[in-house]
Amino acid sequence: NAVAARAITARSPIAGSPVVGGAIRSDLRGPREGREMDLDFGAPLWLPGQRGALLGTVDTGVAEVDRRSDLRRLEVAGALRSAWWEARDAQRAAQVARERVNTAQGIARDVARRANLGDIPPTEALLARNETLAAELAFAQAEALAAATVATYRTITGGLSPDTLSPEAVRAGEAHPALLAARASVERAQAQARLVAATPRDNPELGVFARREVDQLAGDSTSLGVRFRVPLATEARNAPRRAEAEAEITRTTAELAQAERLVNADTARAEAALRVAEANARLARQRLDVAREQEGIALAAFRNGETGTFDLFRVRQLRLEAAVEEGRAAVEALRARSRVNQARGVVP
């Protein structure tokens, strides 16, 4: 709004505020019957091309503010993406912890049954009970962390639940907001340079005046006139303004080049990380499938009395590690897609 308000000046028929002035003079000697009164009215005039150049600075300034707002929106989207994935990661960890509790309780029942029958020592039943308690403790901690991350996400989003959204797919972005903002800054600096070039001197002023003279001897008289004032252009005035405008163009152009390099580097890095994350997720799924099959065989062997409790828990621990890694790898692969979209400037 502050930038757009300058358009009011550019649309005005005069280049600034009008001026009203006056003066009264009287004789100091004699009967003081001679008096003179002046009334002036003047206004600054636009220089050739100055008005259009000022409108150009307004348009480019508004465009820069809009582009900066888009960039800020992308930054907020990045924070929301990060908070959402933190919540989903914690929820996935709580789900794995719950599965650990369920399997631990199932094994504990089998171990207790065999211990009651005398097939295995009672110490192995205590081992199963200890594992169940450890699983329940880990689940309580994971559930508390998930609740905390969900609460953080709700605070950021104003009460929205992370369950209302689904993982986003990789999308091809249009022009990146950071590049658009940098280009808008260059255009604003160029428009300012054009305004400096169109204003080589202060604005001329055109005015009218009226004079009323009262004199008992010579008689009263009234006169009207036109006054015109044209400031002269000097290097002492213009050189610093040109240098400042050129320096601003140089600065914004350098920032644009830097933004292009950073955006390209961030996009390439995010795409490479996505390929690695997807490969890791495939390997983690394969490992989990093997671990589940191995656990099923070990559990069947335990129930048939072919293996002991320690061997079963060792195989089960491998499956739990594989499940944790698979969950983490799956979330990381989906998060890598969001990072690619963020690097490409895609707003969800």
Q: Where does each model-flagged region fall?
A:
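Small/polar-residue-enriched beta-strand and adjacent coil segments characteristic
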Residues: G16-R72, S185-E187, Q192, T199-A259
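Acidic, low-complexity, intrinsically disordered peripheral segments
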Residues: E325-P348
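Bacterial Sec-pathway N-terminal export signals of envelope proteins
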Residues: N1-I24, A43-W46, A53, D59, ...
